[in-house]
């Protein structure tokens, strides 16, 4: 009896084991394939409901676009708790917002004529009336520091008290200003070039708001333009608030242009391939809805439009069209086979749906890895891009079959592209190359690898706040003007904590600050510093009746006289408030930096830090280098490191995904090689062409890898299917897979190539590089997937094309039998 029970139990477990081995994957296949069969039936029975639902969602998401706004601040690439951000916040807490300066300058001898010079002085007074301007410093409202012997204090006396009537008066005033006020040299004028400048300090409450934009476009620019017309003089305008405003306006203008161009280019290429207005219209409808959804999601999440999120709508067009190509191409193939519309649409959804889902997941994964970078800018880009990539897949699989179900069958002329002679010749050429020229393929690949590696060693890491801005725009030319005349517009701040009340005004501290400002003045890429020591030197000059030879730090004895005068000076005359805090403990040194790369910026920082370490012992002082220029430097380096991690994560995630789909470790390596090679080629090209690694260019690798691996999935899925159908005959399977998928892979790659190539017309350097590099990468990826991948499969057939190594996949991407 016990033996019978034992026998029955063993038999039961053996049956269960057999079921697991033989039938689990079949059950898995039934579940997934039946899922797509059910989806296809649902779509074809509820077309009107689906289209109406999509219409309602589109209207709802469209209503969210009212919440879209453009970024009015520089992108902070660092996490909030990063030490550099904490240092910058500490500086702002002591001295307030630093990026409020807008500067106007004129370099024209014609300015120094009575009428025009008076108008220039009046211009500053007219602008200062606006509530958006906190205060201004100009020749017209300049006050000279004077000694008041009677009250033993300093007072401010207007330098210009009347209008000028003759050229002689102006010449005398100019000589007096340039020769006797060294404190204002390179602040309000450049003595060498005779350039004069007006500094407008915006109210820090509006500098990061829409009010700033409205003020610049509606008030400041019209007044400046009128002055230029009336006086026939060019006024140069700059400063970070002004530059950011015009830059945002350019982003806004280009976003609309790219959406239109991407639609036109992809639709044009699509029509060239399919020769069907109906198919082109349906594709345009799908991607247009996708664009509305993209804008809607940006508004729904309350994200701002940045240089990256502005790329998402055209990106959705470029990625959405290949989805349509696969679906419509398969539909037309089915129609050509049997001419049954319903059967064709059902097969399209059930056969292409799963493969298209997988490819969109890998593309979305490439973008989703940006979420792990700890950068708000990239987090938002990654979230919105990955959501919308999956959304465009859903729209494609729902809208295209639904619309075709209402339309008549394609005409014979619309199916002729399936048998184009040139396309057949191209595919046959690829088959011949893979069959007969494997050595040539491997030799070419090896040569490309060697050349690319040499190029990689030429790559430099760089980046600056204005490097990627449109160089053909007037505001960029004005940036270069101010760099040449006044040393730059990007603020670099040094915060000095003396750790004692009134420690700043100690003579020993002033001498240390003097040494540091002298070091700054010797660096060609920095403007002369504005600091407390220069103001004290100006006070000494004023004490000696304005004699410029006394523009120097006081002696110990002179310091006592000066301090007595400074203490008696009325608060309204206090000229220290912007460079020394109210307690006298903190001082700031402000300088402005030219548009130098991060590599040069690091050397400048090292040079300054060496002086700081020498002059300011840490037990008595805490000196911090900060400012927007330095925060950007740290942000760039931080972002590049995070994007390298992001790329590694994208490769790992997609590798795991491929392993899960195909259940073969060797297949993972085979599939990665043709997709990593194009990345290496792109990196090599960057080295040879002098394109640096920076946030805008390193994005290329994660994006391109996520897209290029789609072709690999399509090819390997078809190859896996052919292996089963041809009883593990590798050569037959490879050739059949190449013939079957080659056309669609070629079509989609060409659309992607030209779609991304649209971005090279951008006036932004980063966007231009992004478009060009992704296009090149995807072109190499197409060649690699169509030649190198099949060649590898043929060469490694004994190692990977067997039932033990190449197991049945966890997910049946394509149906086992095409004709079922």
Model-derived features: positions:
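Signature of alpha-helical transmembrane segments and their immediate interfacial
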Residues: 28-70, 402, 416-465, 477, ...
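Extracytoplasmic
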Residues: 89, 118, 164-277, 511-514, ...
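Interfacial segments of transmembrane alpha-helices in multi-pass membrane proteins
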Residues: 252-305, 372-376, 645-690, 761-764
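Pore- and gate-forming transmembrane helices of large, multi-pass membrane proteins
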Residues: 255, 284, 323, 336-373, ...
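Hydrophobic, glycine/alanine-rich multi-pass transmembrane helices and their short helix-loop junctions
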Residues: 269, 357-400, 404, 655-659, ...
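Hydrophobic transmembrane alpha-helices and their membrane-interface caps
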Residues: 280-327, 667-716, 757, 784-787, ...
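Hydrophobic alpha-helical segments
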Residues: 294, 298-411
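Juxtamembrane segments of multi-pass membrane proteins
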Residues: 433, 437-558
């Amino acid at each position: 009896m016990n033996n019978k029970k034992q026998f029955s139990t063993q038999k039961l477990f053996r049956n269960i084991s057999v079921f697991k081995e033989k039938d689990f994957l079949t059950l898995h296949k039934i579940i997934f394939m039946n899922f797509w069969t059910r989806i296809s039936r649902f779509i074809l029975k509820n077309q009107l409901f689906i289209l109406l639902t999509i219409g309602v969602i589109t209207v709802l998401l469209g209503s969210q676009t009212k919440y879209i706004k453009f970024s009015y601040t520089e992108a902070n690439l660092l996490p909030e708790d990063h030490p550099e951000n904490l240092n910058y916040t500490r500086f702002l807490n002591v001295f307030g917002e630093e990026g409020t300066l807008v500067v106007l300058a004129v370099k024209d001898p014609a300015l120094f004529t009575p009428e025009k010079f008076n108008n220039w002085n009046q211009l500053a007074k007219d602008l200062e009336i606006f509530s958006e301007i906190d205060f201004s410093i100009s020749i017209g409202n300049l006050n000279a520091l004077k000694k008041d012997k009677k009250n033993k204090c300093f007072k401010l006396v207007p330098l210009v008290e009347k209008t000028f009537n003759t050229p002689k008066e102006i010449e005398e005033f100019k000589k007096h200003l340039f020769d006797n006020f060294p404190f204002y040299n390179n602040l309000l004028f450049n003595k060498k070039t005779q350039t004069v400048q007006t500094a407008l300090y915006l109210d820090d409450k509006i500098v990061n708001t829409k009010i700033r934009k409205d003020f610049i476009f509606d008030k400041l620019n019209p007044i400046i333009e009128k002055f230029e017309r009336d006086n026939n003089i060019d006024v140069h305008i700059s400063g970070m608030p002004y530059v950011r405003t015009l830059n945002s306006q350019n982003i806004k203008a280009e976003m609309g242009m790219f959406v239109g161009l991407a639609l036109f280019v992809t639709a044009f290429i699509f029509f060239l391939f399919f020769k069907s207005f109906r198919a082109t219209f349906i594709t345009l409808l799908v991607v247009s809805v996708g664009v509305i959804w993209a804008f809607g999601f940006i508004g729904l999440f309350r994200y701002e439009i940045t240089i990256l999120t502005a790329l998402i709508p055209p990106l959705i067009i470029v990625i959405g069209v290949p989805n349509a190509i696969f679906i419509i191409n398969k539909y037309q193939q089915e129609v050509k086979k049997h001419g049954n519309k319903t059967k064709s649409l059902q097969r399209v959804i059930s056969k292409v749906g799963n493969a298209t889902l997988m490819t969109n997941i890998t593309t979305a994964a490439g973008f989703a890895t940006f979420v792990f970078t700890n950068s708000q800018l990239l987090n938002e880009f990654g979230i919105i891009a990955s959501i919308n990539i999956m959304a465009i897949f859903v729209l494609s699989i729902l809208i295209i079959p639904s619309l075709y179900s209402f339309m008549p069958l394609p005409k014979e002329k619309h199916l002729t592209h399936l048998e184009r002679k040139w396309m057949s010749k191209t595919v046959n050429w690829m088959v011949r190359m893979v069959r007969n020229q494997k050595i040539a393929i491997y030799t070419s690949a090896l040569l490309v690898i060697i050349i690319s590696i040499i190029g990689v060693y030429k790559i430099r890491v760089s980046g600056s706040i204005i490097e990627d801005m449109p160089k053909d725009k007037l505001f960029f030319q004005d940036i270069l003007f101010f760099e040449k005349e006044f040393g730059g517009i990007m603020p670099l701040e040094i915060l000095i904590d003396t750790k004692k009340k009134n420690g700043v005004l100690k003579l020993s501290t002033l001498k240390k600050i003097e040494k540091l400002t002298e070091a700054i003045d010797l660096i060609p890429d920095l403007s002369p510093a504005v600091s407390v020591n220069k103001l004290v030197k100006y006070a000494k000059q004023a004490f000696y009746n304005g004699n410029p030879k006394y523009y120097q730090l006081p002696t110990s004895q002179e310091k006592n006289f000066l301090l007595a005068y400074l203490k008696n000076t009325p608060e309204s005359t206090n000229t220290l408030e912007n460079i020394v805090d109210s307690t006298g403990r903190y001082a700031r040194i402000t300088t402005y930096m030219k548009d130098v790369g991060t590599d040069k910026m690091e050397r400048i920082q090292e040079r300054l830090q060496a002086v700081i370490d020498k002059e300011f012992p840490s037990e008595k002082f805490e000196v911090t280098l900060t400012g927007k220029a330095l925060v950007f430097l740290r942000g760039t380096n931080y972002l590049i490191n995070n994007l390298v991690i992001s790329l590694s994560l994208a490769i790992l995630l997609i590798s795991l995904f491929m392993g899960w789909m195909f259940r073969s470790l060797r297949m993972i390596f085979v599939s990665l090689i043709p997709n990593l090679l194009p990345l290496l080629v792109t990196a090599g090209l960057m080295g040879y062409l002098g394109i640096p690694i920076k946030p805008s260019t390193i994005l290329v690798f994660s994006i391109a890898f996520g897209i290029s691996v789609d072709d690999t999935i399509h090819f390997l899925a078809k190859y896996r299917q052919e292996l089963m159908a041809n009883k593990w005959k590798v050569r037959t399977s490879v050739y059949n897979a190449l013939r079957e998928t080659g056309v669609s892979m070629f079509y989609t790659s060409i659309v992607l190539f030209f779609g991304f190539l649209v971005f090279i017309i951008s006036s932004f350097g980063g966007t231009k590089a992004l478009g060009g590099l992704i296009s090149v990468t995807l072109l190499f990826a197409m060649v690699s997937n169509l030649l190198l991948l099949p060649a590898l499969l043929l060469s490694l057939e004994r190692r990977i094309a067997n039932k033990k190594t190449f197991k049945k996949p966890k997910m049946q991407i394509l149906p086992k039998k095409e004709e079922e």
